[in-house]
Amino acid sequence: IYSRYPIHSVKALYYKNSSNMSLIADVRINNQYIRVINNHFETTSVNAYRGIITAPGKSLKIRAKAVKNLILQMKDNNRKRTIQADSIHAEIQRSPYPVIVCGDFNDTPASYTYHRVKKGLTDGFQDVGNGYQYTFRQLYRLWRIDYVFYSESLKGQNYFSPDVSYSDHNMVVWRGCVKN
């Protein structure tokens, strides 16, 4: 987490049986603290199997096995994201400060992950974004799986997700302020 404002404390939150994690930082802005929770939740694993499933010349048997393995992996990864979302929801509830919760959630707005973390917060895209915006650059650029959520005491001013190819995800840019 980079900030032009002083970072008072940082805590790393590691998830069991996962290489993913979240960072929690208390940032002092003027005379007020804001808790920033940056997340990287468990992947869908689609990219790991996509090459086998779509490669020309692969037999139907090999492709079918890859699809079956992908479905099993997606089920396991969804379970991991559920645990991660519950953990972050608990961190939000314990926070003595307004929160900004952001990052790669690897899940859609229809998911348990999205709704669990967003509960009681504002989705930056829904608040101040406009038009159609995706964050996952693959699978026909249909998916918004990276988010910025924030407490009611904060005010969104701008939100966008520029189409740049630094990653398989577009970055999310949100600008906001503390409400008067």
Identify the meaning behind each predicted range.
Residues 1-51, 160-164:
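Structured beta-strand-rich core segments of catalytic domains in phosphoester-bond hydrolases
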Residues 5, 30-31, 35-45, 67, ...:
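Noncatalytic linker/hinge segments flanking ATPase motor cores
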Residues 15-17, 73-87:
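Soluble or luminal CAZymes and related metallo-dependent hydrolases
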Residues 28, 62-63, 143, 175:
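Alpha-helix boundary/capping detector
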Residues 33, 58-60, 133-134, 180:
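Short, intrinsically disordered/low-complexity patches at protein termini
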Residues 44-55, 75-79, 108-113:
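Phosphate-binding glycine-rich loops and adjacent basic patches that engage nucleotide phosphates
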Residues 50-74:
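A solvent-exposed, charged loop/short amphipathic helix patch at secondary-structure junctions
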Residues 82-83, 87-100, 105-180:
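Metal-dependent phosphoester-hydrolase catalytic domains
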